[in-house]
């Protein structure tokens, strides 16, 4: 994917965001009062009857059966269970708000932290099922202990026989707004049989299929498992099929497993995506595992086909073979921090079709023996473009490792702290075009390309994961115009006499510096 296409995706998603922002304002306006609005239904774990008023709340299933498109359901504190395949089934565009204080009169007050509302699958069923061309909202709920074993509707079939998808939330062909929830302790599949004829679980916490315009924002997705006894794909969440305009933003995706076994058929401990063009922005993806032995693919992020846009995410402390894996991808990977992962490789690209990926303004650091790797195939040669990236090792391994059938363009790159800086193991079938690369503290720089620079980048505090450029950095004003107008923090390029190398454009001393973790991750998550 070229830079112009990356820009067009950002513009289209930004315009879609204006509509969604306006929608959130409408949904989050003044609180309705007791049953004066006929579209408000009130629910409690001990509710009864069909009045569903603030003074006389009803049961959850009663309210769901009475609700019409546009209605708002307020759920009081407590635990709600269900029967059958799911705790709740949504086929209308309604809103479910957790955290209602249960007051029988007066203004409706919500505080999900003070009045936790739990939808409990009891490890016996999926928690939430959403289907159809609808736009429901889930806000302020705890979605827990779901189990989708045997629920194979809408599951992929390419990685063994499916045996369950979406333990916490399953959405197929819908456009849900899933915001400010805790999605915890769910499993997509428990069955064991063995890959490739066996079973695969998809999306332990959340599964979206053909969910264009979906919004998944401000959630904590924690301790979910895709495949508890066999192959697994997407421990935290799995995105599949058409997802144009879908937005996965400002979530905390923590301590999820693609599979809890030692099997290598493990893809995407945190977030896994298939074909589609979702925006995945500003998420913290931390402490996830691809499998129990730390192998598998994409411990933090995994993409297989598609053209997603990953921007401003923090991927750290994940365990597996690669922290980020993009296969057959045309994605834009921009402004991300991939740091301190317990992996063999920080980021790997694998094959390409209909154009390749573009990486802009990323920091990939201390995430295994190889910081960046690229692999192609004679039938699917990989072409990739890297602009303004900072690649830092732990004193050993490879900075850039290229296998066969790869064409790689590197511009304004920092490569520091490796045994080998840039290397190609198959120079007869692969080509690396490196221009304006800063080399530092590598035992062997390897392929230096054109206009190489030697010198200390003077990162501000690399021991603490801060790879912003400090005073006297050899990267200052040493680059070339690569068509990149901002840096990893959104600051303008250039700020000095020329373009700085790597992901950061150093700010003038009079401007306030903020540590990197505060930029991509909202403080209110």
Regions found by a protein language model. Give the residues of each.
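Acidic glycine-/aspartate-rich tracts in secreted/extracellular proteins
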Residues: 46-50, 71, 77-81, 99-106, ...
